[in-house]
């Protein structure tokens, strides 16, 4: 991503996704802020709690507490990025006043919360800026987004500011359904090179982008 940041000037960059509870939050804060700084404030931070127990076992991180750990790490990151001398005392991360540099270029790095459970919807509503479930039936996406906005309102946040992103195979009819459902951004997963030219040529034709 650092290479992509250096080689571009306008596209936004996003992690999709960073398994946050597997990271040291103080180191992650510096790495993420550095990337946002060198990109000129173009980073969206996609995070998730993880699902593969063996990864957590290999790292010595308790699998069962990954959700609570993620929530606390998010709170710690916000403190490290916003305070000149940051201090945080929690169950999973605890540090006395420290200086954490560099600070992000953006005043607030957008947090994309991945997942498709009710708990993920709650995390997005309470702590995130974007809810980013993987491709699901449109009705499921609408239900999850509604739940995320409910949790945002309960947390004293503006529910209208919780965006909904998802992924798609790029089928034009599916994309139209997502737009109608209020999805603001769609990720079309990468494919083998031999498939890309044909697929994107079809998308260009479907959306009349030849002269765009």
Model region roles, listed by residue range:
Residues 1-212:
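Active-site-adjacent structural elements that line small-molecule/cofactor binding pockets in enzymes
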């Amino acid at each position: 991503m650092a290479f992509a940041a250096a080689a571009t000037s306008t596209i936004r960059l996003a992690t999709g996704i960073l398994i946050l509870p597997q990271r040291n939050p103080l180191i992650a804060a510096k790495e993420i802020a550095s990337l946002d700084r060198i990109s000129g404030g173009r980073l969206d931070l996609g995070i998730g709690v993880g699902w593969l127990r063996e990864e957590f076992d290999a790292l010595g991180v308790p699998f069962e507490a990954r959700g609570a750990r993620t929530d606390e790490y998010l709170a710690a990151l916000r403190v490290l990025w916003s305070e000149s001398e940051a201090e945080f005392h929690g169950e999973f991360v605890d540090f006395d006043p420290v200086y954490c540099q560099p600070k992000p270029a953006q005043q607030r790095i957008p947090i994309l919360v991945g997942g498709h459970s009710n708990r993920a919807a709650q995390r997005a509503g309470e702590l995130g800026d974007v809810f980013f479930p993987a491709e699901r039936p449109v009705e499921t996406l609408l239900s999850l987004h509604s739940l995320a906005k409910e949790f945002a309102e309960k947390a004293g946040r503006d529910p209208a500011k919780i965006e909904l992103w998802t992924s798609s195979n790029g089928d034009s009819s599916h994309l139209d359904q997502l737009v109608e459902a209020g999805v603001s951004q769609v990720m079309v997963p990468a494919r083998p090179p031999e498939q890309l030219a044909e697929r994107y040529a079809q998308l260009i034709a479907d959306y009349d982008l030849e002269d765009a």
